[in-house]
Regions:
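Bacterial N-terminal signal peptides that target proteins for export
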Residues: 1-8
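Bacterial N-terminal signal peptides
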Residues: 8-16
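Boundary at the C-terminal end of the N-terminal hydrophobic targeting segment
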Residues: 19-23
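Primary mode marks residue(s) on the alpha4-beta5-alpha5 output face of response regulator receiver
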Residues: 27-139, 143-242
Length: 242
């Protein structure tokens, strides 16, 4: 699939959601991202992944969360069924070689990460229009001395999906979907030198005004909604941890 910017290619891999070419022009400044050095885009993508690890999944200016909804027996029943289907469908991927054989691809396998995303891009495309709990976009693994340990999965939806529709996929009273927002890309021409403590998905700049003042290019939201589920955990709090 053709993507319009190098950043989109790297970040789409990181986000486990293939970006549509027609969506890119709607992102302010996205076409100027072509000038970013590949090493910079890789570092920024790694920052996104690190921000999605369990220990970093908290409120900050670069993460937007769905509003929690009132709990109900029906929502909890639905959530339990999703977890059951997911657990059964990914059990075989405890052998990570089976995941690779079925088309899941590891993002940045040679760079240390708290959690690795094995992504099936066909499933990601399917998730743009429908939800199948047995076909998560990404599998989540921790690195071990002899391979990878399966710990969970990630579902995705487009950035245009409403909270009502997200709730129909995975109840918002039980889980909270998140999106990566308020990203300031470094100014053009900085090569490998931009200060990534200021720019990118973990940088201190998080408003369009501040980004413009710094000479950067502001993206209101990159890619779609995501939710992590850890179906092998023993309590609902850990199964839907964020």
């Amino acid at each position: 699939m053709k993507l319009t910017t190098r950043l989109a290619i790297v970040a789409a891999l990181a986000m486990a959601l293939p970006a549509r070419p027609q969506e890119q022009p709607s992102q302010p400044g996205s076409q100027n991202a072509q000038s970013l050095d590949p090493a910079v885009t890789q570092k920024m993508a790694q920052g996104v992944l690190e921000s999605m690890s369990a220990e970093h999944m908290h409120m900050n200016a670069h993460l937007k969360w769905t509003e929690a909804r009132p709990q109900s027996a029906e929502a909890f029943r639905r959530a339990e069924e999703i977890v059951k289907v997911l657990r059964e469908s990914i059990e075989k991927y405890k052998d990570y070689q089976a995941a690779l054989a079925d088309g899941f691809k590891i993002f940045l396998p040679h760079i240390p990460q708290p959690m690795y995303h094995f992504t099936n891009y066909r499933y990601g495309l399917e998730a743009e229009t429908k939800f199948d709990p047995a076909r998560p976009t990404s599998l989540l693994y921790k690195k071990t001395p002899d391979g990878y340990e399966l710990i969970g999965a990630m579902y995705t939806a487009t950035r245009f999906t409403t909270e009502d529709d997200l709730d129909k996929r995975v109840p918002l009273s039980v889980a909270r979907w998140h999106a990566h927002v308020n990203i300031c890309l470094p100014p053009r021409g900085q090569g490998q030198t931009p200060d990534l403590t200021r720019y990118g998905p973990t940088g201190s700049i998080s408003t369009e005004d501040d980004c413009t003042a710094a000479g950067g290019r502001f993206l209101g939201q990159i890619f779609g909604w995501m939710v992590h589920i850890y179906p092998f955990e023993q309590t609902p709090e850990k199964v839907f941890a964020h």
